[in-house]
């Protein structure tokens, strides 16, 4: 990952075609992870997949109540929307919980190759599409000129678009992404 440095390492700093590979490898990592048979791997006790989405809304609402320093207009509306609009399909799988460039490592040089996913303290069996949502929530659709509204700790120039990443995830994982706005 580019953490602790200014910009991407060579050749990804100047080779925009190679840089695209970083994003595809990032998404392939969680897409492939979502396909792991977690029961066969003995991970039955890693999480509680039943009622996962309901618990998430309750958990984060309660957390906010404990730390709230001011009113957040619209928060209750958002929580109610999440409770009323479940994902189209929920297929439990292994999820990281904080999946992003900062929590992956790539092999040195091109082509981009994902080497490791690190920082697993929020890992669980839940909805893997939450990881996808975390990756694309601020991802620009026009990465040729991302603009200041998409300021990020990584240079997004030359990366695949948000739509291209969603299509890639669907292709590799076999999961639909039509309900990505939920995430």
Report residues per predicted region.
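Catalytic-loop of the protein kinase fold
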Residues: 94-96, 101
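Active-site activation/catalytic loop segments of kinase-like enzymes and analogous catalytic loops
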Residues: 130-174
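Hydrophobic residue at the +6 position relative to the catalytic HRD Asp in the kinase catalytic loop
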Residues: 104-106
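Activation of the activation-loop gatekeeper triad in protein kinase-fold domains
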Residues: 117-123
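C-terminal, non-catalytic tails of nucleotide-sugar-dependent glycosyltransferases
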Residues: 76, 84, 168-179
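ATP-binding pocket architecture of kinase catalytic cores
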Residues: 1-77, 81-94, 108-112
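All-alpha amphipathic helical-bundle segments outside canonical DNA-binding/catalytic cores
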Residues: 47-48, 176-183
């Amino acid at each position: 990952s580019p953490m602790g440095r200014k910009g991407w390492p060579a050749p990804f700093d100047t080779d925009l075609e190679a840089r695209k590979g970083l994003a595809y490898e990032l998404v392939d990592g969680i897409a492939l992870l979502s396909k792991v048979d977690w029961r066969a791997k003995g991970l039955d006790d890693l999480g509680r997949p039943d009622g996962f989405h309901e618990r998430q809304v309750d958990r984060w609402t309660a957390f906010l109540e404990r730390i709230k320093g001011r009113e957040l207009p619209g928060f209750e509306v958002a929580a109610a929307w999440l409770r009323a609009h479940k994902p189209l399909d929920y297929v439990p799988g292994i999820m990281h919980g904080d999946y992003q460039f900062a929590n992956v490592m790539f092999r040195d040089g091109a082509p981009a190759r994902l080497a490791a996913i690190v920082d697993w303290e929020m890992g669980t069996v839940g909805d893997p599409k939450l990881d996808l949502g975390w990756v694309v929530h601020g991802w620009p659709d026009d990465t040729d000129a991302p603009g200041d509204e998409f300021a990020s700790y990584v240079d997004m120039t030359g990366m695949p678009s948000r739509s291209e990443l969603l299509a890639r995830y669907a292709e590799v994982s076999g999961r639909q992404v039509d309900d990505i706005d939920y995430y």
